[in-house]
């Protein structure tokens, strides 16, 4: 009789946007950033949208013109609530924006840098290798893996969730992602 296997799936949040935020020493969770080539038309597809910018109703694969439209719409609403209906400045940080209604929502457009994303992906893969043998790591994409942890749970005396969280924390501590 075959024993059931245990797998974990790790999908890094808004990976390209997170890399671009870390490269700018910014918080990937609070920085409004899209990865897109602004030299193309506004119809270009964004390769990634940061979590804080998604809160304005954007999908992860929005077109640049949609980002512009959604942010403009959100700014129109904010302006009504701003003192004297005038913005004092702008910010691309969701924490600052939440604290100060007189700030205009801004965002960073980061041109794609695939080679840099591959470097981060390699660093992250090497972190997985600290815990798991390569034959048990199944790469799905640049930022997603499925890992067979069946034989590691007793070794580490952890649940699958605990092992996943240990690896994720190591990734965060090492890369900021």
Show the residue positions of the predicted features.
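Residues that scaffold, gate, or flank divalent-cation-dependent active/transport sites
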Residues: 1-153, 160-161, 165-175
